[in-house]
């Protein structure tokens, strides 16, 4: 059962869910929202399982209306904008975006960089706020693409780095 922790506001300081857990007594209620038919659908269960093994209560949802109040809401390849009511019900609302924010705001940043011939793709973990791609930045990383990488290899690397930032 997810509880309402709206009074417990803390700041993530560059360690994803692990740092938030330390701040919030070790056990978190975590919701992961992803698009039901999106590219992460085939692998997101592995992130859920890893977080559960660490003692967290984890719920995977595909629709904004199914998001309960949580300590941490991860919005991972979630194709819908989230209302302020939903954002305000969670302690943290975290997004992983494949650009060097604030540069590269908008949809499908990895795709545009691949089209532009980039092989080193920046990736950013940040706090979701009402304005798109505008929240506080907590972590940055890079996805390194090989010359012959096809979409399956690119998505695998993207998923691995996304999950690393969330753990």
Task: Please state what every model-predicted region is.
Residues 2-167:
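One-carbon transfer enzymes
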